[in-house]
Amino acid sequence: ILPSGDLTNFGFAMRDKGLSQGWRGEKLDLVPLDQPEAAPVGTLERALYRPLGAQTSAVHLAGRIRNPRDEGDPVFLLGKRSSRKLVGPGLWDGLAAGMIQAGETPLEALARESQEEAGLTAFDPVKAEFLACDRISRPVRGGWMHEVSCAYAALLPEGFMPEPVDGEVDHFECVSAEEALNRIEENLMMKEAAMTLLLSIRKLL
């Protein structure tokens, strides 16, 4: 285990040199890249992970509205990301998504993000359908993204429409599977949200 004080001082030094992506005051578990399933060796400020190429973990939720008139024509909920977002401003996202914070389980993160971004106060993450966990590795602005992305799907009541809560989502829309696929094809959707949506659609086939 790395001393928390050393990691904190290291983080402040990176920030003071302008090497961090802002500063969020949010800690994530730090795990070795070559041992992604190992216990965390410490925690580090979220804004340092991409510049360092350190591994993060995230959850993504695809929301589908029940359509009793035509179960073969699914309706999905997409959120328009705020123009103020550092990553993917203005792109389309799933119902909820976010980093797994230090000490959280994926389901705990799913419940928190669902409430923070979409106001789902009564959402039970245990009822969400697990789709897959994938490892992502690609260059991003200001660094490198190494991430374990956990995808889930949830069926929501007919007529349900979430309300943006924390300002990270501009608004939500209900779209057909065809329209969602069009937005993916036109590169209007976040890559991880697109992957989650495609997995959800495939489950329905």
Predicted regions and their residues:
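N-terminal leader/linker segments that precede catalytic domains of diphosphate-processing enzymes
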Residues: 1-91, 98-116, 120-161, 177-186, ...
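Short glycine-enriched loop/turn motifs at secondary-structure junctions
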Residues: 164-168
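Short aromatic/basic micro-patch
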Residues: 174
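Anionic ligand-binding catalytic core segments
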Residues: 192
